[in-house]
């Protein structure tokens, strides 16, 4: 009886460690693709004409909107796949390539083109004109973050694991919101070279993640073709 209890305890420990590792993986992947550090110069340029209180409110609304977008994809992404007949392995390959492109831009300390268009204009009289576009979409919850969310959900098999993905989204958005709220402070304390160095490090990590995602997708597609 004691032996059974001991085995049961060890099984639970291993199970919860796997869940913790999945949460950390999800949080880190989302944090890197959101890239709040790299967004600091953009957010500063978009919001500096507004008073400080208004800037904080803009960032808060953008974070909430971005969180809702990612949660919608997390909860209903599989239905979208089913409707369009998209397999998860095909999405892994396509999404991995997109993440690799974003990571490549980050390695060169460039703003990913999927996140920003140089010809975007601002209407300073309307806060919502920058809260939803371009701040919430595509800067914060851009194609990279949406792709990462969908891939994380594809790895889940239980309600608990789906809850872990939701928690990863909320955590990554919370930390990103805190960082972006400190944009003025960080701009004053850290020069652009320090920000670029951090972006390059995050880009290197994202390259590794994207290559692994592409490889997993290719193996899955090959196996499905072999079975047929």
Swiss-Prot record:
It holds the Pfam family MarC. InterPro entries: Multi_antbiot-R_MarC (IPR002771). Keywords: Cell membrane, Membrane, Transmembrane, Transmembrane helix. It is a multi-pass membrane protein. The chain crosses the membrane at residues 22-42, 68-88, 133-153, 163-183, 201-221. It is found in: Cell membrane. Its main location: membrane. GO terms for cellular component: plasma membrane. Belongs to the UPF0056 (MarC) family. NCBIfam families: NAAT family transporter (TIGR00427). This is UPF0056 membrane protein MJ0972. It comes from Methanocaldococcus jannaschii (strain ATCC 43067 / DSM 2661 / JAL-1 / JCM 10045 / NBRC 100440). The lineage of its organism: Archaea, Methanobacteriati, Methanobacteriota, Methanomada group, Methanococci.
